[in-house]
């Protein structure tokens, strides 16, 4: 998993551009919960989906 993928990080889904920008809510093992602008909260498996890191919340 990308070391930048941690709570508060801003990400995009590589195959779902329509979901918009997402903010990582939690990371537990390979499970990442992200709150996307247009898709709401989604639980993703980082072994299956490699999220694109956009930046930090700060």
Question: What kind of feature is each model-predicted range?
Answer:
Residues 2-58:
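Basic/aromatic-rich interaction segments and small domains that mediate binding to polyanionic partners
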């Amino acid at each position: 998993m990308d070391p930048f993928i941690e709570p508060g990080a801003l990400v995009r889904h590589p195959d779902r551009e329509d979901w918009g920008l997402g903010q990582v809510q939690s990371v537990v093992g390979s499970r990442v919960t992200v709150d996307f602008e247009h898709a709401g909260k989604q639980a993703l498996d980082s072994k299956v989906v490699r999220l694109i890191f956009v930046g930090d919340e700060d």
